[in-house]
Amino acid sequence: MMIEVLKSKIHCARVTEANLNYMGSITIDEDLLDAANMIPGEKVYIADNNNGERFETYIIKGERGSGKICLNGAAARKVQPDDIVIIMSYALMDFEEAKSFKPTVIFPDPATNSVVK
């Protein structure tokens, strides 16, 4: 049996931009993607801590070291710059494998979105 489990999470990142005029997606600093074990094109689930919105989109790679977290297109209507969001991705895996699987969870610096080591 296959089940869907949390694979990666960027916990409490700060939204830096909301760009309504770009077609869909979330742009994420490449440093955060690497640290969280996420890739461009990957489906992600976003939870906005400020307003309770929850939605899905896909990742676009942002400039490394920029701290960029930008919601694009229709998703830009669901957030405001400076909102705090949780970005999660999931993976399908065998039930037995899932029992011992440990997701990658990162906690970016709240002011800069830089990776905290």
UniProtKB/Swiss-Prot annotation:
One of its GO terms (molecular function) is aspartate 1-decarboxylase activity. GO terms for cellular component: cytosol. It is found in: Cytoplasm. Its EC number is 4.1.1.11. Substrate binds at residues 57, 73-75. It catalyses: L-aspartate + H(+) = beta-alanine + CO2. InterPro entries: Asp_de-COase-like_dom_sf (IPR009010), Asp_decarbox (IPR003190). Its cofactor is pyruvate. The keyword Transcription does not apply. The modification Pyruvic acid (Ser) is found at residue 25. Pathway: Cofactor biosynthesis; (R)-pantothenate biosynthesis; beta-alanine from L-aspartate: step 1/1. The active site is at 25 (schiff-base intermediate with substrate), 58 (proton donor). It is an enzyme of class 4 (lyase). One of its GO terms (biological process) is pantothenate biosynthetic process. Keywords: Autocatalytic cleavage, Cytoplasm, Decarboxylase, Lyase, Pantothenate biosynthesis, Pyruvate, Schiff base, Zymogen. Is synthesized initially as an inactive proenzyme, which is activated by self-cleavage at a specific serine bond to produce a beta-subunit with a hydroxyl group at its C-terminus and an alpha-subunit with a pyruvoyl group at its N-terminus. The keyword Lyase applies. Catalyzes the pyruvoyl-dependent decarboxylation of aspartate to produce beta-alanine. Heterooctamer of four alpha and four beta subunits. Belongs to the PanD family. This is Aspartate 1-decarboxylase. The gene is panD.
